[in-house]
Design a protein with these regions (language model features):
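Acidic/His- and Gly-rich active-site-bordering loop/insert found
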Residues: 3-121
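Fold-level recognition of mixed alpha/beta catalytic cores in primary-metabolism enzymes, strongest
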Residues: 121, 125-142
Length: 142
């Protein structure tokens, strides 16, 4: 089976559990830098799949970087996971979906990375809508 098919099979087989994660995050909207539930939920799923987790990234208590390294030469392929909500609007921005889909994509790719080499990285991006410490996205590139 091709690597692409292995990834697609993982996604198809597991998509409903990720939809459930997205719904749970949607039901508990958290503003920028307050995304305790959302970041913990995404981190827990990544840990279940052997990703190494760094937390409190770039001055953001709810930021994280999750890495799965095959140990083989190859590219680092990154996914940006946003998960903050809008004041008074909740997840009208869809970040519950964006964050969860990024984790699903990363874990899907992890299914073949030991065969093809490289590493998979998820940048957990709190406060994408801004906030007192600014967007984590901007902090990552400083």
């Amino acid at each position: 089976m091709s690597e692409k098919q292995q990834i697609l099979d993982y996604i198809e087989t597991n998509k409903y559990s990720y939809i459930e994660i997205s719904h749970r995050i949607h039901e508990r909207p958290e503003l920028g830098n307050e995304e305790i539930f959302a970041s913990r939920t995404l981190i827990d799923r990544l840990k279940e799949h052997d990703f190494e987790i760094e937390t409190e990234i770039a001055g953001h208590a709810t930021g994280f970087i999750a890495t799965y390294d095959s140990g083989l030469d190859g590219p680092a392929i990154g996914f940006l996971a946003e998960y903050d909500a809008l004041p008074g609007l909740g997840h009208a921005c869809g970040h519950n979906i964006i964050g969860t889909a990024s984790v699903l994509g990363a874990i899907g790719l992890k299914q073949v990375i030991d065969q093809i080499g490289g590493k998979v990285v998820v940048l957990g991006c709190p406060a994408e809508e801004g906030g007192e410490n600014g967007s984590a996205k901007a902090s990552y590139v400083k």
